[in-house]
């Protein structure tokens, strides 16, 4: 599929997720088969652009593949300016967040709260598309709640504005992450517009990815929570969609991917932040590799990157 001038070589994308899709995780997922990965959501508020967190999110050196950056805000001029700044820092695709269900985001009239204001959506999309010379994409939910589903209206506004691709998470904001994703809504959008459509929600296995693509007609699928502690899922999905073959990495191969991820994470964040951020990722890996193990508690008590790597290597030796 194409997004603007870019040919994407895999139909499996990594979703933008705050606190998750930092550069080390994006690089790993790209190496394992993700055709496109999105950065963590960047606020368009200029007051926070100079923080350490923003500095790391703006770090686009050493990216693999196309550099797609997600931004979130509610003021058209501010969002357009943020898009230009990110392009200046190396963004090759700008993604606009209108799907985040978090209260702290919605209180600022950003994320999925914007779905309640279609006219504002149109102004934001027009402003950003006209501000940058890179493809602009959009991520939404199906609506604010079950009585206010306006995904078709938003999709048509997006297409008119020149949005290059639309990702739809098959839930309303009110659903958060509960219940089942409504793939029939994604199918309806695919039938109503001509731009590429990316299906998102509950895609956690190769067969599920194929079923969703077949049912909705979507051009690609986007993986979010299913990738936690399972970056090899991208390799499994890509192999299955291309050949129909199921691959299952060995425990040792998965452990080596975990070690590589944590080493890269430590290097990216440094000693003080690295060991803290590693804890959640290792917890997710352990849920896959050694469910029920007491090692998680031991690992979380460690307070240096060196101690963490020694402990992880000892664990790997014990479970091979």
UniProtKB/Swiss-Prot annotation:
Signal peptide: none annotated. It catalyses: a 5,6-dihydrouridine in tRNA + NAD(+) = a uridine in tRNA + NADH + H(+); a 5,6-dihydrouridine in tRNA + NADP(+) = a uridine in tRNA + NADPH + H(+). Keywords: Flavoprotein, FMN, NADP, Oxidoreductase, RNA-binding, tRNA processing, tRNA-binding. FMN binds at residues 16-18, 70, 139, 200-202, 224-225. PROSITE patterns: UPF0034 (PS01136). One of its GO terms (molecular function) is tRNA dihydrouridine synthase activity. Its EC number is 1.3.1.-. Gene3D superfamilies: Aldolase class I (3.20.20.70), Putative flavin oxidoreducatase, domain 2 (1.10.1200.80). InterPro entries: Aldolase_TIM, DUS-like_FMN-bd, DUS_fam, DusB, DusB-like, tRNA-dHydroUridine_Synthase_C, tRNA_hU_synthase_CS. The active site is at 100 (proton donor). Its cofactor is FMN. The keyword NADP applies. Belongs to the Dus family. DusB subfamily. PANTHER family: TRNA-DIHYDROURIDINE(47) SYNTHASE [NAD(P)(+)]-LIKE. This is tRNA-dihydrouridine synthase B. The lineage of its organism: Bacteria, Pseudomonadati, Pseudomonadota, Gammaproteobacteria, Pasteurellales. The gene is dusB.
């Amino acid at each position: 599929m194409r997004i603007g001038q870019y040919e994407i070589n895999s139909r499996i994308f990594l979703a933008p997720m705050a606190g998750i899709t930092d550069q080390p995780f994006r690089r790993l997922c790209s190496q394992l088969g993700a055709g496109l990965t999105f950065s963590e959501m960047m606020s368009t508020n200029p007051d926070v652009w100079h923080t350490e967190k923003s500095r790391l999110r703006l770090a686009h050196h050493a990216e693999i593949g196309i550099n797609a950056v997600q931004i979130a805000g509610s003021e058209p001029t501010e969002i357009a300016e943020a898009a230009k700044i990110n392009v200046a820092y190396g963004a090759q695709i700008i993604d606009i967040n209108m799907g985040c269900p978090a209260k702290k985001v919605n209180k600022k009239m950003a994320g999925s709260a914007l779905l309640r204001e279609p006219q504002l959506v149109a102004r934001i999309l027009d402003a950003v598309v006209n501000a940058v010379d890179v493809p602009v994409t959009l991520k939404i939910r199906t609506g604010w709640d079950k009585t206010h589903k306006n995904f078709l209206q938003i999709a048509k506004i997006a297409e008119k504005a020149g949005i290059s691709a639309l990702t739809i998470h098959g839930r309303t904001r009110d659903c958060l992450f509960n219940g089942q994703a409504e793939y029939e809504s994604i199918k309806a959008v695919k039938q109503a517009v001509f731009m590429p459509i990316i299906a998102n929600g509950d895609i956690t296995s190769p067969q599920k990815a194929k079923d969703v693509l077949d049912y909705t007609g979507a051009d690609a699928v986007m993986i979010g929570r299913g990738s936690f502690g399972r970056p090899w899922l991208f390799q499994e999905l890509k192999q299955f969609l291309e050949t129909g073959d199921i691959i299952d990495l060995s425990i040792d191969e998965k452990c080596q991917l975990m070690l590589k991820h944590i080493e890269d994470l430590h290097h990216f964040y440094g000693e003080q932040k690295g060991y803290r951020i590693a804890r959640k990722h290792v917890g997710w890996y352990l849920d896959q590799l050694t469910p029920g193990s007491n090692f998680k508690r031991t690992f979380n008590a460690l307070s240096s990157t060196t101690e963490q790597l020694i402990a992880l290597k000892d664990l790997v030796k014990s479970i091979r």
